[in-house]
Every structure is written in structure tokens, then in C-alpha cells.
UniProtKB/Swiss-Prot annotation:
Main location: nucleus
Composition bias, Pro residues: 83-94
Region named Disordered: 63-125, 137-192, 246-273, 381-431
Record-given protein name: Homeobox protein Hox-B3
Subcellular location: Nucleus
Function: Sequence-specific transcription factor which is part of a developmental regulatory system that provides cells with specific positional identities on the anterior-posterior axis.
GO cellular component terms, A-Z: chromatin; nucleoplasm; nucleus
Amino acid sequence: MQKATYYDNAAAALFGGYSSYPGSNGFGFDVPPQPPFQAATHLEGDYQRSACSLQSLGNAAPHAKSKELNGSCMRPGLAPEPLSAPPGSPPPSAAPTSATSNSSNGGGPSKSGPPKCGPGTNSTLTKQIFPWMKESRQTSKLKNNSPGTAEGCGGGGGGGGGGGSGGSGGGGGGGGGGDKSPPGSAASKRARTAYTSAQLVELEKEFHFNRYLCRPRRVEMANLLNLSERQIKIWFQNRRMKYKKDQKAKGLASSSGGPSPAGSPPQPMQSTAGFMNALHSMTPSYESPSPPAFGKAHQNAYALPSNYQPPLKGCGAPQKYPPTPAPEYEPHVLQANGGAYGTPTMQGSPVYVGGGGYADPLPPPAGPSLYGLNHLSHHPSGNLDYNGAPPMAPSQHHGPCEPHPTYTDLSSHHAPPPQGRIQEAPKLTHL
């Protein structure tokens, strides 16, 4: 009884100015000649009619039940003209009845399938008494596939578009049901398309082969997948944007961390100026048969003949190795050929070896056999590439970071020929 009195009071406040308001059952705001319809919808009429009227007039009653009916009653309640008369009443409603009473009438027939716009929604059709009161949401969705019904829904302006996709005519009706309308429905507001898994597999396969779809192929896929060309075009647009976003995220992750799986690996190493890049370019160069390849590799790694900056930049770190043989090597370094690095037996043309030192190609134990570079002694003309004496004056050697101990330490460290190259890789990685 609380419910009845609540709706009585609300209806009295809303419809007090209209025609006779007889009793506590909530009927009779409208013109009197409608007894069959009132008798038919006695149980849910007062409940839904009052709730729809409250919501259609914008009076947001803080009642839980009326909020539950937001999706179900909003759309019929907002449709003013086409639902002017229920099917059971003999004449349509009289002209003096306003849009409010029409909306309250419209709330009655929507018993269990509220957002339906069945075939008899137009005001001219007064047949079809009760069939669409028994419909569920799914059956109304199927009916809305036909263009006639969709036109009826859109033309009514009531916002009851295809099964649950709200039309733009009703302001609050949009998205009330929350269902996805079928792709064929021409509702005034385009619904979100639900693709089946088979369609998605085909679309993804096509996107894998070609990210941009030409029109003949698009028409072919539309026929194959029972979709419209527009849907396929929009799916490809969205998929391209997603692909671009994924690539951007991958690029950010790879620049902050290790080498990216798809990108070029040396890029982050070059940016940090690490010795890994030098090691990668140096290790294959030891087996290279001719001196020019050896020289080119070291130009890439250390840029010695033209520019001595990268080793100077990185030689702060190598100084943490204890330079034990430094005292006995330094005098020879300064004697030999204007300050070139190397062993005490160094003569005229020092050769730059991978450990960072200069070694003489003539004596076998110290110079070329450090890294198995025996071919260097047979090419005296190639030594011009590696001869560091003219560009590397002693002023550069005693520059910002004193590299004598480091380089002599490294070159003396690897005196045994076979183990030199094996020990070289871990040393250079940790520099």
C-alpha cells in the first residue's frame, strides 16, 4: 500500500490539472473512454505509468524502483506522438490530451519488452492488440532488422532505436538498455558493432597481410563476412591506430631498456657510448684477412685516426684496474716514436691492437701475436692506417685522463697469445 499511496501523491502532484482523478489505483488521468486498456494493464499500469511520467517530466524521484525502470520506461515515456493511442482503445486520444498524457499512455503497453518498436508502433495502425506485450528483448531485436521498423523507431523520435541502442530523439534514452544492436539496424545513433570471432579472425588475417585495404578487396570481404563496407573500413582504421600505439609503446620500452626486438640493436648502445658496441665491431675484425678491414673496424669503434674523443671519454672507467706494470713501461712509451703506446721493444711503426694498446709488429711475443695478427707484419703499407704517432702527440696522451697505465696494463696483460682474445671479451664488457 505504500507504493500505491506514493504513486498517488506523485501522480496528484503531476496530473492534478488534468481530467478526473477518481481513486487510489492511479488510473483516470486521461479521457474517460478507455476502460478495456485500463482493465488489461491493471497490475503494471499504475507502476510503470507513474514511473514513466515522473521520469518524462524530469522529476527525478529518489525511489529505487523508479531508478530500476530507467532503461525500460524511459524510451516509451519520451515518445510523444506515435504512441498516442493504445491498440485496445476504440478511438485515438482526443486532441486536448497533452504530450504528458500521451507519454503516460505509452508507458502502459511496454510490459516486458519496453524498448520495442514493433510493427504497429505508428499511430495509424490500431490493430495487433497484444502480441508485442509478450515479446522479449531478443525477439524485438530480431524484428528491428527490417528497415520498416527501424524507420518507425527513428521517425517516432522516441529514442527507442534497435534493441537497446538509444535513438537521438529521446535525450536520456540513449544507451538505456545497453545492448548492442545488430549491424543492419538503421538507428539514428550508430550502435557499437559486435563482431563474431570468425569475422575477427578473417579481419586480423587480412590486416596481417595488408594494413590498407583496397576497395575491391573490401567489397569482397564485406560479402564474405556479412558486414558492410563501412564497418570493415572503420575496423581497419581502428586496427591501424592500435598497431601504431603498440609500436610506439614498444619503441619507448626498448629505448629505456635493452635492444628492441624489432628495432636496430646498436641504437641504445650508441646512445650510452658503452664499450659493447666497440666489442661487437672489434671481435670479427681480428680474423679479417686484410689490414684495411681492421683499420675500418677501429675507426668505427674508437675513431682513432681522425678523432680521439670516444676513448678519452671512456678511459675514466678503465683506470680502476691496478696499473701494476706502469712504471717500467712508461719510459719506453715516451721514448718510442713520439709517445705511442706499446711494449719496450717497440721500433718504428706501432700497430694498434684490440686491447687498446699499441704493439710493435716485429717481435713475435709482444706485438702481432697478441691477437694473432701475424698478417700485419707483412703489410708495412697498411700500418699507415694504424700508426698513431703523428696524430697522437704526447699532449693528447697527457690530456684529461691519463691513459698510459690502462693501455700498457691491457697490452701487458694479454701477453700469452691464445688466452689474450679469450680474456679480452669479459674485460671490455665490464669497462
